[in-house]
Amino acid sequence: MTLIKSISGIRGTIGGQPGDTLNPLDIVKFTTAYATYIRRNTTNGSNKIVVGRDARISGQMVCNIVCGTLMGMGYDVVNIGLATTPTTELAVNMSNADGGIIITASHNPRQWNALKLLNNKGEFLNKAAGNEVLAIADSEDFDYADVDHVGKYTEDNSFDQKHIDSVLALQLVDVEAIKNAHFKVAVDSINSVGGVILPKLLDKLGVEYTFLNGEANGNFAHNPEPLAKNLTGIMDLIAKGGYDMGIVVDPDVDRLAFICEDGKMFGEEYTLVSVADYVLSHTPGNTVSNLSSTRALRDVTEKHGGAYSAAAVGGGNVTTKIK
């Protein structure tokens, strides 16, 4: 049994004793601490927090507790349901919300879940903000809303389409070229939210597809980290022929891996470098990545006349470095 506290939120295994795992009492405690931090530091005025989750078995339970706690803190909750991490980040920004909570343990196994905390721009909290949330949780300096100020609850399932529309509107995305290529792909969405949004995106792009583990039921068919040792199913399928490529995502779709037409991994590091090369060739500029990324990112950035900077591991640290 494990509970890990960090600047980006808390994660742990479900069940067990308070203080040692991700259990209902600690979910309430850290959600309350986050809401307290937002109340003290955000001036959007919307009094609204977005909540999204991946398809983990524990997700509905955790979501119910998070939403109820936020309402108890006087916040109106917009529950966008099963949603990718990038979709939830986008929803915070599009809704002019005060913040957001993503309920996902990313590539960790099914017994794990987590609360990932966002600011009012849909960005992960930086180090200072994350430490303030942890300090508030430790002090338990909480003040819940009275009966006349309890928050409202709404559900909004429109953000998958809004996310897809925003991607297709990017100048760097040549929709017609993709349609004219008549691609056929295999997709492993590991029984989570990739199986909800990716068919909608691929349909818009005119891509023919076969899904493996496409049902978003949280019963992960294999270890959800998108590494070659976990992806023999889709790699073997593509190696038999008939597909242009394979697409693999993790449970909250913030990690992406490609499989080549011969069934071999293209690799996450190569994907990042290839995308950076394409983007910088059209829109030159500087780049930032975390210290665990490949050195090739520096090389491709400098090739296009830009400057590369490295940040500590963590989405909030990368965002801070960009700014």
Label each PLM-derived region with a short phrase.
Residues 1-68, 72-73, 152-185:
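An N-terminal, well-structured beta->alpha segment
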Residues 3, 42-44, 92-95, 108-110, ...:
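Solvent-exposed alpha-helices and their adjacent loops that cap or buttress functional pockets
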Residues 3-4, 12, 179-203, 292-323:
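A structured phosphate/pyrophosphate-recognition subdomain
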Residues 13, 113-239:
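Gly/Ser/Thr-enriched, mixed-charge loops and adjacent short helices
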Residues 36, 40, 48-112, 200-259:
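N-terminal small/polar loop signature for handling phosphorylated ligands or for N-terminal nucleophile
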Residues 49, 187, 284-288:
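Conserved PLP-anchoring active-site segment centered on the Schiff-base-forming lysine
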Residues 59-64, 130, 195-199, 298:
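Short, surface-exposed alpha-helical segments at coil->helix boundaries
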Residues 134-165, 260-323:
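Proline/glycine-rich low-complexity loops and linkers
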